[in-house]
Amino acid sequence: MSKTSGQTSQNATSAAQNVACAAQDAASAVDTIFTAPHLRWGVIGCGVIANQMAEALASVGRTIDGVANRTQEKAVAFAQRHHVKRVYDSIDDLLASDEIDAVYLTTPHNTHIIYLRKALQAGKHVLCEKSITLNSAELLEAEELARQNGVQLMDACTILHMPLYKELVSRVEAGEFGPVNLIQENFGSYKEFDMENRFFNPKLAGGALLDIGVYSLTLARLFLKSQPHDVLSMMNPAPTGVDQTDGILLRNAEGQMVVLALTLHSKQPKRAMISADKAFIEIMEYPRADIATITWTDDGKQEKVQVGRTANALAYVLADLEAAVAGDASAQAQLEVSKDVMELMTSLRNDWNFLYPEEQ
């Protein structure tokens, strides 16, 4: 055998081994992430996040059973791209199907309540992208519809589902770090001023608070003992009137404080700092974080905590809904956090006299 052919054979063997290892990793991920019985999933909406979800599921061996979109051509293209089993002629047809158990709702914020009503009344479990609704009243309505129809409603905000946060919250609640005193978070993205896109268009429920602030407030609420009752804030509007930059200060009955800085028109690190008596916890890129650094107060030593995988963020979201359907009480309780966060966001926008067209 020539040297070249021998190398080719070795390369082929190595490639085959890599494929086998990847398959084993995917199977292991499925076993680790999905512990409850699988549901048959339909996706409503075919935007960026829906495509990310489809890719995340494919990477761990799961598929989507159906898709529907207001534009049929987009649904067909989505199905072809992600090997979706069936394209429905309309969203109503998908919701009427007895071949779909649960839906992942990815349409713009201001349409969520429309499809939540339809899906929940159709007896479908719903995983709804953030921001789950526009305001507290809508979320309470959706919660009641879920209760009446015996189905689960869940917020897809990744903070609620990442294994890292479940681990850190458990350690905080066990008192390992002492009382949490202060939480500081930054979240900044630079978005060009396109007044027709979802970031700045009030007709698409644009603005920093509902788009990125929901992450910051959700993280903060996870580590607070109770809902903040003192709320101070300032907001700078974009030319369209939606909030472009927000500064938020919160305090609860226990004296725990939260300081948040949010902007859609300046880049800054997505950084969270949770400060307690015995240590502080730093988390970078926190919306889908899998790593945190703990610095101990007494000796300055650092501990790296790594739990889960950022790449599996959306798979964790879907797995939690399936766990809730199977009776997991902790997964079912996540909506309480979402309700507190929505209450805060509604209060903040009321303070700013900032209502969306649907609310006026």
Where are these regions (language model features)?
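C-terminal helix-rich "cap/oligomerization" subdomain common to oxidoreductases
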Residues: 1-11, 18-35, 102-104, 253, ...
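Hydrophobic residues in well-ordered beta-strands that form the structural core
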Residues: 88, 128, 153-155, 283
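A contiguous active-site-proximal alpha/beta segment in oxidoreductase catalytic domains
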Residues: 133-192
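Glycine-rich "substrate-gating" loop/helix at the edge of Rossmann-like oxidoreductase active sites
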Residues: 203-210, 235-239
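N-terminal Rossmann-like dinucleotide-binding module
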Residues: 2-82, 358
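Contiguous beta-strand/loop segments that form the cofactor/metal-binding neighborhood of enzyme cores
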Residues: 2-3, 218-289, 319-329, 359
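Beta-loop-alpha module in the N-terminal Rossmann-like domain of NAD(P)-dependent dehydrogenases
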Residues: 53, 85-145
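Oxidoreductase and adenylate-handling cofactor-binding alpha/beta cores
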Residues: 161-184, 210-235, 249-256
